[in-house]
Amino acid sequence: MEIQSNFSLKNYNTFGIEAKAKQFIAVHSVEELKTILKENKNEKKFILGGGSNMLLTKDIDALVIHIDLKGKEIIKEDDDFVWVESQAGETWHDFVLWTIDNNFGGLENMSLIPGNVGTTPVQNIGAYGTEIKDTFVSCNAINIETQETKTFTNAECNFGYRESIFKNEVKDQFIITSVIYKLTKRNHKINTSYGDILAELAKNNISEPTLKDVSNAVIAIRQSKLPDPKELGNSGSFFKNPILLKSDFEQIHKKFPEMKFYEVSETEVKVPAGWLIEQAGFKGKRFGDAGVHKNQALVLVNYGNATGQEILNVSKEVQKTVFETFGIKIEAEVNVI
């Protein structure tokens, strides 16, 4: 295990932003992780996973610990369900494909989401009607201060829309090392409630979709709308879809009757942030090397040599204009560093 100094993080964040780490080390086992934490107790630390949900606006004046724990295994099963444990450093999409290849259901709608397994509970990632909380059983984590292992159950994670205990009450206190999911072995609950998925399946004349069919449909949709970070730096959806009280939404809807929305409860509706941003005139707009993607207004992109600050400035301009136009605040889903 070698600590490197003045280390470039350009290849460790999907925006492809050039930023330096004061110190950097990759860890490949829980034992290595505990040792590094113990030996560097008084150093400032920054924990790095897949780098897919962050915007680096400056160099990191800390010891960057890259979690590169690999491996996955079935830890329990019965006739109907299987409990699978994945190490935190596994690439999420590869893990999803592995579950589908084994005919384990529950994650297929979240195919092609960038990032690693370890960050999935932090954000409670989700797509096309499913979220991590639907299949999440528990995760194992190391206390940064004491190096003790703690298991967080689903209930203890306080999951909300792109929220969890790891973004709030215990933020920066734990490092997730593995995650356990409970998946179906039969009687899969195929979720094709989103119109895009139904349209993609219909295009391929599929009326009774398998897990693989749904995954392929989601992959096709995402590839048509979202740029590949290897070709164009981005972090997927930069903004959360705002959730409004119905009473507030009704007032706004009177002014903008064409506004799209989805009911999330008896008292709340979700408005697509991408629609708001597009209507505000930002879709495809470019500011130097930073901009809003031409096919999906939720996505901010680095066209080459944008700095994190330049991308942040674009996001602030988008937020300001959307609020001035619609009276709706949109929040960043990405962690700004």
UniProtKB/Swiss-Prot annotation:
Keywords assigned by UniProt, alphabetized: Cell cycle, Cell division, Cell shape, Cell wall biogenesis/degradation, Cytoplasm, FAD, Flavoprotein, NADP, Oxidoreductase, Peptidoglycan synthesis
GO molecular function, one term: FAD binding
GO cellular component term, pick one: cytosol
Active site feature: R162, S237 (proton donor), E333
Cofactor(s) needed: FAD
Domain of life: Bacteria
Membrane-spanning parts: none
EC number: 1.3.1.98
Residues of the signal peptide: none
Pathway connected to this protein: Cell wall biogenesis; peptidoglycan biosynthesis
Presence of keyword S-adenosyl-L-methionine: no
PROSITE patterns associated with the record: FAD_PCMH
Every FAD-binding PCMH-type domain range: 17-186
Swiss-Prot/TrEMBL GO biological process terms: cell division; cell wall organization; peptidoglycan biosynthetic process; regulation of cell shape
Catalytic activity line of the entry: UDP-N-acetyl-alpha-D-muramate + NADP(+) = UDP-N-acetyl-3-O-(1-carboxyvinyl)-alpha-D-glucosamine + NADPH + H(+)
InterPro entries: FAD-bd_PCMH, FAD-bd_PCMH-like_sf, FAD-bd_PCMH_sub1, FAD-bd_PCMH_sub2, MurB, MurB_C, MurB_C_sf, Oxid_FAD_bind_N
Cell compartments where the protein resides: Cytoplasm
Main location (coarse class): cytoplasm
Role noted for this protein: Cell wall formation.
PANTHER family: UDP-N-ACETYLENOLPYRUVOYLGLUCOSAMINE REDUCTASE (PTHR21071:SF4)
Family: Belongs to the MurB family.
Protein name as annotated: UDP-N-acetylenolpyruvoylglucosamine reductase
Gene name of the encoded protein: murB
